[in-house]
Amino acid sequence: MNNTNPQSVLINLGSTLRQLRMRKGFKSAEVFSYENDLNRTAYWRWENGQNITMKNLLKLCNIHKISPKELFEIVDKKYSLESKIGLMNEPESVLIKKKAK
């Protein structure tokens, strides 16, 4: 994750948390947070790209049975894909200027 935008990383982290929750069979963030002893409002914020503490991040990793490294590998893939899609949507003249630098 070189030259990453912190807000984009948080948004991708939130999206990843949402996917992991749904993969566990929880359609509702409220039910998931209740079942896993998480603050409902805080969990909603994390899924929506707001800051999360390391303590809570580690708790979520334990809930999903993945390591922080595995979690951030998923987030990094999303960030890389997002960057590539962003480049595809830029006008050709902007891309030529970027290559010239």
Show the residue positions of the predicted features.
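Short alpha-helical DNA-recognition segment
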Residues: G25-R45
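DNA major-groove recognition helix of helix-turn-helix
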Residues: W46-E47, H64, V75
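DNA major-groove recognition helix of helix-turn-helix/homeodomain DNA-binding modules
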Residues: K55-L71
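The alpha-helix within a helix-turn-helix
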Residues: R21, S33, C61
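Short, charged recognition helix plus adjacent turn
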Residues: M1-S8, E73-K101
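Short coil turns linking two alpha-helices in DNA-binding domains
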Residues: N39-A42, T53, S67
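A short, Lys/Arg-rich alpha-helix, primarily the initiator
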Residues: M1-K24
